[in-house]
UniProtKB/Swiss-Prot annotation:
Stretches that traverse the bilayer: 22-42, 198-218, 239-259, 274-294, 305-325, 360-380
Purpose: Required for resistance to linearmycins, a family of antibiotic-specialized metabolites produced by some streptomycetes. Part of the ABC transporter complex LnrLMN that probably facilitates linearmycin removal from the membrane. Responsible for the translocation of the substrate across the membrane. Also mediates KinC-dependent biofilm morphology.
GO CC annotations on file: plasma membrane
Transmembrane helix among keywords: yes
Lineage: Bacteria, Bacillati, Bacillota, Bacilli, Bacillales
The protein's name in its UniProt record: Linearmycin resistance permease protein LnrN
Signal peptide from the UniProt entry: none
Conditions for induction: Induced in response to linearmycins and other polyenes via the two-component regulatory system LnrJ/LnrK.
A Gene Ontology molecular function term of the record: ABC-type transporter activity
Source organism per UniProt: Bacillus subtilis (strain 168)
Keyword annotations: Cell membrane, Membrane, Transmembrane, Transmembrane helix, Transport
Length: 385
């Protein structure tokens, strides 16, 4: 054990003796948290959109409520088409979503109604707005199909089944009573934009740091450090354990300091400490495993850093570390289901927003444990080869 701790201590000293590492480990994530958190926070920074409901039916009204239910980035306002067009000309709104007169009829026939989205050329967020609107429409389409199936089984009109099952969810009084009766948690709450970006950028930069740290295995092999350790009666298992422990400790030091810093600087409450410790520990084990896998398949520390950074940055984008995952296309959200960052982010959101404890995130912890087991096994096997 002393030999393992000695190797771990050496690796820690190598990481923290370089001043530039402090910038990438602490300064960069805190700065980006401040910038992105400020950009995404507050109504004044949200995209203001008008909704023109030409159909004025149960489903069109329910669709509007769905759009307004998740307004982290957008502010929706119902108005007439003439008023909306005038406001768009005056640039008082960024765009107009028009719900056509055949909206409910098309949904009843199992078809996908066409959404009309008008906006000015200066709206850079137009693709994201359209994707958000289409995503909400796809959800509504699924709900209508489910209500029609249920109505056939129960022998009642599909509208009655739909009102009973889905429309009631959006009545103000029902969620309030349910939450107070069943639990003292804020069911369905979402973390603030600053808290979400703090979690996302902490995950991103911890992964970047650990990818670079994993490259020290290659450097140690190249410089003959492993050979000298083996001749000094240190086993391969002890060497490997020392490096793995150092990566894990480095990750926790960085994550821990970021947690405390964001709490002091931005007032973020990270929730239940035990849940955070368990979740972050499992995620760090997964990242160590990924680092070992990449290190085993490249030849130089430079290649490790290049491939590692490319993997981390790309997968963090898909997993919603930079922005809310809800605004991404469906196929990207499906890909994110197979990435550990997405599950770590989901767990942290549950802890921060809903006050989740360890028992509440056992499913997420189980998924991260599976990720860790697979990546560790693959990485260690490749290193031995």
């Amino acid at each position: 054990m002393k030999k393992i701790l000695a190797i771990c201590g050496i690796e820690l000293s190598l990481i923290f003796k370089k001043p530039q590492n402090y910038l990438i480990m602490f300064a960069a994530p805190l700065l980006l948290t401040f910038v992105f958190g400020s950009m995404l926070s507050g109504n004044d920074d949200k995209v203001r959109l008008a909704i023109v409901d030409q159909d004025d039916t149960i489903l069109s009204q329910h669709y509007i409520r769905q759009l307004k239910a998740h307004d982290d980035m957008y502010v929706f306002e119902n108005m007439s088409e003439s008023k909306a067009s005038e406001k768009l000309k005056q640039k008082k709104i960024a765009g107009i979503i028009v719900i056509s007169r055949s909206f409910q009829t098309q949904l009843e026939k199992g078809k996908h109604p066409e959404l009309i989205f008008r906006h000015g050329p200066e709206l850079s967020e137009a693709p994201m707005v359209k994707q958000y609107a289409e995503s909400a429409l796809a959800t509504l389409n699924i709900q209508v199909t489910a209500a029609k199936t249920a109505s056939q089984t129960a022998g009642e009109n599909w509208k009655a089944a739909y009102k009973t099952v889905f429309a009631k969810k959006h009545e103000d009084i029902v969620p309030a009573v349910t939450r107070q009766t069943l639990s003292d948690k804020k069911e369905g709450a979402e973390a603030s934009d600053t808290a979400s970006r703090a979690a996302g950028f902490s995950i991103l930069f911890v992964m970047l740091t650990m990818m670079g740290a994993a490259g020290t295995i290659l450097e140690a092999r190249k410089n003959g450090v492993w050979s000298r350790l083996l001749t000094a009666s240190v086993s391969r298992a002890e060497i490997g354990a020392g490096y793995v422990l150092s990566f894990f400790v480095i990750g926790w030091i960085q994550f821990g300091i970021l947690l405390l810093s964001t709490h002091w600087l931005f007032g973020i409450n990270w929730g239940n400490p035990a849940a955070v410790i368990v979740l972050v520990s499992l995620f760090l084990l997964t990242v160590v495993g990924i680092g070992l896998m990449i290190a085993a398949n490249v030849r130089t520390p430079e290649q490790q850093l290049a491939f590692g950074n490319l993997f981390v940055i790309a997968t963090c984008m898909v997993s919603g570390m930079y922005w809310p995952i809800d605004i991404e296309p469906k196929f990207m959200q499906s890909i994110a289901e197979f990435l550990p960052q997405k599950w770590a982010m989901s767990g942290l959101t549950e802890i921060i927003a809903n006050g989740a404890r360890v028992t509440d995130i056992l499913g997420i912890c189980g998924i991260l444990l599976a990720f860790a087991a697979i990546t560790f096994a693959a990485g260690l096997k490749a290193l031995r080869a």
